[in-house]
Amino acid sequence: MSEYIRVTEDENDEPIEIPSEDDGTVLLSTVTAQFPGACGLRYRNPVSQCMWGVRLVEGILHAPEAGWGNLVYVVNYPKDNKRKMDETDASSAVKVKRAVQKTSDLIVLGLPWKTTEQDLKEYFSTFGEVLMVQVKKDIKTGHSKGFGFVRFTDYETQVKVMSQRHMIDGRWCDCKLPNSKQSPDEPLRSRKVFVGRCTEDMTADELQQFFAQYGEVVDVFIPKPFRAFAFVTFADDQVAQSLCGEDLIIKGISVHISNAEPKHNSNRQLERGGRFGGNPGGFGNQGGFGNSRGGGGGLGNNQGSNMGGGMNFGAFSINPAMMAAAQAALQSSWGMMGMLASQQNQSGPSGNNQPQGNMQREQNQGFSSGNNSYGGSNSGAAIGWGSASNAGSSSGFNGGFGSSMDSKSSGWGM
């Protein structure tokens, strides 16, 4: 006649009664049906209080000499299975520990000035139960300082809130652990990645669908106006870190993934002056090379070329003192030319020379000093500072400042 014996995995657990065979033995298959992986039974001896093993022969468990009795029998497992079970129990304990981890205050940055504590509580209540909200205010004025604190009941809610950006009263805000609350040996890794080389036809939905293949995406942010990059926030920081440094193909375009943490840029921008183009002292504007007009006096298509505060001729520069000396020399030279021209006019025109007074001033030709223009109809293509060749006794610039009549030249040769 069969009887029921009490069997359990642990002495402290509630036992299960399993039936025996008609001959009083218990089949090992009967035990493994209730306890998969079991390989035997043991029990605590009432006299010695030591654990005794039950005899097993060809898959059949034989009762002790005194019979099965009311003892509680503990299941035996192979060592490998026991080790796996211990590891499973340890991992389960870690999961339970994480699940019951206490929440902490979160700092909310970037709050609008008009946001009140009630507004803050109503917003975060959509994520879960809120224990506390506080908007920091100035003691003297009573106005908001633009940040506050919030605490939730559940740790899962806290993690979810920290993993995304929040639009509060029309403004994007960030919610994170304060620096003082962050453990130094367990730094909070970023769940956000920077996606560079984006194109304008990439939408937030398309980015979310693409990155969803790597893990849960909680937020996608594309700055407005478009700046060729975006931010993607994952629920798991390990997914975000695994993608950093990768080049991925989205809609046929190669994008680069990097960490979204702010970096200190050691490269300073150049000063406004001295850049290439559009600034004083640079290339392409006043006092430089290019299309300067008026008071810069650069080489090129200068119009007017007033002798102002210094000129640059390639590597050769003229300061105001040298310019004043040049003006004095030119005035002296042109004074002598005026006297010679008046003497020639009294004796009548000769050759191709024309009176000094009838000389026409052409744009981009000649040299301008104050309101006086010097040039010549036969002075050739006299552009800028003396590049024309003289014809006869014409009054042009021949590679220097001053005048050249016949074989006589006065001024500075260059």
Swiss-Prot record:
Segments of skewed composition (Basic and acidic residues): 261-274
Subcellular location: Nucleus; Cytoplasm; Cytoplasm, Stress granule; Mitochondrion
Residues of the RRM domain: 104-200, 191-262
Biased composition (Low complexity): 342-373
Annotated segments matching region Disordered: 261-303, 341-373
GO molecular function: DNA binding; RNA binding
Gly residues bias spans: 275-303
Annotated signal peptide: none
Any one cellular-component term (Gene Ontology): mitochondrion
Keyword Translocase applies: no
Domain notes: The RRM domains can bind to both DNA and RNA.
Role of this protein: Probably involved in transcriptional repression. May play a role in the maintenance of the circadian clock periodicity.
Assembly and interaction partners: Homodimer.
Protein name: TAR DNA-binding protein 43
Species this chain originates from: Gallus gallus (Chicken)
